[in-house]
Amino acid sequence: MKLSSYPHLVKEWHPTKNGELTPKQLTSQFMLRHISLGMLLSFICCLLATSQSHSEDLGLLSLSMRARVSEQTVLGKDAPEDFEEYDVAANFGLPWQSYSASGWGTGTRLMASAGILRGAGEDALVVSLVPELTLGSEDGRFTLDLGVGGALFSRSRFGVQDYGGPFQFVLTLGVSAPLYKKLGLGYRFLHYSDASVNGPHTIGADFHMIEFNYRF
């Protein structure tokens, strides 16, 4: 893909000719790093405070491995670059839940993930924390989940595509069902975006992923 196809990206959001970031980009990255760090620290503090009174409700629910299988755009603009993502995730139960005697209801959990994002010949480490609301069986065999959280990228520019900065908002929707005993199979939709914090020309991406999980 040629840079000339996206002149606005080259003009406003790419480094200068000597490879240095513009003052606007430096300021944005500085602010986003501190904002993302503050958000993560605040969320961790909330979890620690909660665990003191609800420690019996917290625990590892499942581990999963995921890989992107489709690049169909659902939200936002089409990504000019093609991406692959592979990651592992751990789901921790949170104390807020309500299940009926039949074993069906709603719950909450925290999804923590780490993986590799690959595009335009470049690789990036991606870590995320996403609180989720779940609907399904209490044993986790059948689950529908929806979550909004944050992710940190070790790099935010891939070829002509600029995600905007190291911090990205994450929107996720997933569904899983039992495959064999404690093993499960699921589908996950992930959307990364900086919500135009860094300007109107940044572009996020959608990820349709297959997910294998193991329930504890």
What do the PLM-derived regions correspond to, one by one?
Residues M1-L58:
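Cleavable N-terminal export/targeting peptides
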Residues Q52-L61, L94-T106, G121, E138-T143, ...:
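Short loop/turn motifs that connect adjacent beta-strands in outer-membrane beta-barrel proteins
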Residues G59-A67, W104-A112, V127, F142-V148, ...:
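Transmembrane beta-strands of outer-membrane beta-barrel proteins
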Residues R66-Q72, M111-L117, G149-A151, L190-Y192, ...:
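Outer-membrane beta-barrel pore domains and translocons
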Residues V74-K77, L117-G119, R157-Q161, A195-G199:
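Extracellular loop and loop/strand-boundary signature of outer-membrane beta-barrel proteins
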Residues P80-D82, D123-L125, G165-Q168, T202-G204:
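Short sequence motifs at beta-strands and strand-loop junctions characteristic
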Residues Y86-V88, G204-F216:
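Outer-membrane beta-barrel "beta-signal"
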Residues A90-L94, L133-S137, A177, Y214-F216:
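Residue-level signature of outer-membrane beta-barrel architecture
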